[in-house]
Amino acid sequence: MLARKFTILNRCLIRNFVRYQSSSLIGESFITKEQISNYLNSETWSVTQYTQFDTDSKVSDDTVLKILKLSGLPNEGIEDSVKLKIKDRLSTQLIFINKLHEVECDYDIDDKYSRIIQRNPKPMTYNEIMLSLKNTEKDSKLGEISGSWEAN
């Protein structure tokens, strides 16, 4: 009787294995590290695809100097070519931010389902906190040392 059950089980496993057998449809597998490196270093898309906007809005020299001063970077004695690069990059960033503000959003979506963690969790009482702390064990994988927070 037991042998018959194992035979039936083996047949089911073999059928399921054959039925769900899969193969690689993505492409040939990598053989050398160079192939992996070449694949990872090849560009598939560029940020400029998504940031090609009208560059009519220019940033003034005063704005560039204020931002450099606020950021703690040197703001005096900067070459004109460097200042021009900073202005162009800042202008592109501001245009991109303005484009983001122009995107229409669906405000009818319930925000409480947009996070993994609940937004309004049930508050814990003091006794529940103490009980959970008492039952918590130190995890050496996370670098927690037993007795490090306990009073001597």
From Swiss-Prot:
It is found in: Mitochondrion inner membrane. The keyword RNA-binding does not apply. GO terms for biological process: glutaminyl-tRNAGln biosynthesis via transamidation; mitochondrial translation. Residues 1-21 form a transit peptide. It is an enzyme of class 6 (ligase). It comes from the Eukaryota. GO terms for cellular component: glutamyl-tRNA(Gln) amidotransferase complex; mitochondrial inner membrane. Its main location: mitochondrion. This is Glutamyl-tRNA(Gln) amidotransferase subunit F, mitochondrial.
